[in-house]
Amino acid sequence: MKKGIHPEMRLLTVRCACGAEHKIWTTKEQLKIDVCSNCHPLYKGSGGASLIVDTEGRVQKFKKKFEGKY
């Protein structure tokens, strides 16, 4: 590796809006995040992939179209 052309890596403590702190290696000097794995609904099990929001009936239309074919 050539000297002087690579950015300096440092261990940074990232602070989330919920108060959690995570340590990562980065070239940034400061990083703040709004949501982390401690407060995101997908990781907490209160929604995410298990929650389907369908306001226009697309899921029902799809199920009706392919009902009994597979």
From Swiss-Prot:
Binding site for Zn(2+): 16, 18, 36, 39
Lineage: superkingdom: Bacteria
UniProt xrefs under PANTHER family: 50S RIBOSOMAL PROTEIN L31, CHLOROPLASTIC, LARGE RIBOSOMAL SUBUNIT PROTEIN BL31C
Self-association and partners: Part of the 50S ribosomal subunit.
UniProt cross-references to SUPFAM superfamilies, sorted A to Z: L28p-like
A GO molecular function held by the record: metal ion binding
Biological process according to GO: translation
Organism: Fervidobacterium nodosum (strain ATCC 35602 / DSM 5306 / Rt17-B1)
GO terms under cellular component: ribonucleoprotein complex; ribosome
Record family assignment: Belongs to the bacterial ribosomal protein bL31 family. Type A subfamily.
Keywords: Metal-binding, Ribonucleoprotein, Ribosomal protein, RNA-binding, rRNA-binding, Zinc
Cross-referenced InterPro entries: Ribosomal_bL28/bL31-like_sf, Ribosomal_bL31, Ribosomal_bL31_A, Ribosomal_bL31_sf
Cofactor binding note: Binds 1 zinc ion per subunit.
Name of one Pfam family that matches: Ribosomal_L31
Disulphide linkage map: none
Name this protein carries in UniProt: Large ribosomal subunit protein bL31
Cofactor field: Zn(2+)
Biological role stated in the UniProt entry: Binds the 23S rRNA.
